[in-house]
Amino acid sequence: MPIIIKDGGTQRDFTPHPEVEGAPAVCIDALDLGWKEGAYGLKYRVALVFYTGLVEKGPEGQNVQLTVAKFFNASFNEKSSLSSFVKQWMGQAYKLPDNDLEKLIGQTALLSIAHNATAARTYANIESIMKLPAAMADQAPPIPGDFVRLCDREDWPGPAPHPEMSQPAAAAVSAEKMPWE
């Protein structure tokens, strides 16, 4: 599902995922969002995206999968929210191989999703997560066949670079040859 940005810089209108307690879900994407400015300064951000099997009709009548995402600072420190979330989901003894978030794609979960409202819109947030019980394994939705990961989409520019590391366009292209060229 594309993330369309309006000219004003805010995201498009969307239907938040309905509030649910104990929804079987599957992790369908791990996003590398790059450097983002937040309330506590510049942080490297990642996200995990889940699909619960719910679909709505889009503006042109097409089926649109409803997804819900959880955003984190990219840190596996024992006190980080990402580390706590993965342990809550996979169990205290679980160690993510090579700290590779993509290894979580395809893993099932049981989610509790709640709405948080602001003056501008309503957001669906993952309030809790746990491993899907074996008795509910047949209720987990499959990853939709037409789903394309964000990093595989043609219109995705990639993670946001650190502002101090990006070069101005004029500096990137230099007509002057270096002595060794």
How would you describe each model-predicted region?
Residues 1-181:
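Short beta-rich binding modules
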